[in-house]
Amino acid sequence: ANDARNVPAIYPNGFLPLINTDTNDYSATAGVRGENGGWRWDASLGWGRNETDFRITNSLNRSFGAASQTEFDSGGLQYSQTLANLDVSRDINLGFAEKTTISAGAEYRRETFQIRPGEPNSYANGPAGGAPGAQVFPGFQPVIGGQRVDQERDRNNKSAYVEIDTDLTSRLNLQGALRYEDYSDFGSDLNWKLAGRFEPIEGVALRASASTGFRAPSLQQQFYAAQATNNVNGILLD
């Protein structure tokens, strides 16, 4: 009750703030598959969106003193993704123990990410002094370090791959694959994979694989930003 972050006139016995989250997910997917000229194909288009909002209850903004509200809209996070995909495959006879399967595909992806700022009193520094912002979860601010962080961020990614899978003998399987990725914000890369499986005797198999990899940071990792202000010996520190 006597904590410097409390206002006894509002909570004479102290308080326990609560973080309430409201999450909404939306998605839609459509696809079609078939076979033509020996090629099996599968095409799809999908879209999804996630919205998470934060509402703080049983709290206060100490810097507004007894005039502080006790519930705050601290803002939220929004993410969406649109994905178009096409995969094809067919079996061909190269004279090995089994037919060789050739697979290929292409994909286009667009992503967006946005921070929704909280209401001003959820992060503001009021006239009464003390710890500013909603206690336990200050709202997202629209500007941090002189830069706006509430703008929608987006990027697109184009990729393609080809893969071969064959049984050289009844006991030896080999696989090889190439994949190309091109991100609008992070550049491009070409990766490969080789794998094999050898069964010297029935029921015993040896596997080995080697590959390279590439992973671009997510939009959330690049653009998520939040700021809180603390009162340390009468000095406000972000």
What are these regions (language model features)?
Residues 2-10, 62-69, 122-127, 222, ...:
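Solvent-exposed, glycine/polar-rich loop segments of beta-barrel outer-membrane systems
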Residues 41-45, 100-104, 174-176, 192, ...:
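Transmembrane beta-strands of outer-membrane beta-barrel proteins
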Residues 154, 158, 181-191, 213:
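Solvent-exposed loop/turn segments connecting transmembrane beta-strands
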Residues 160-162, 189-204:
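Feature captures outer-membrane beta-barrel proteins of Gram-negative bacteria and organelles
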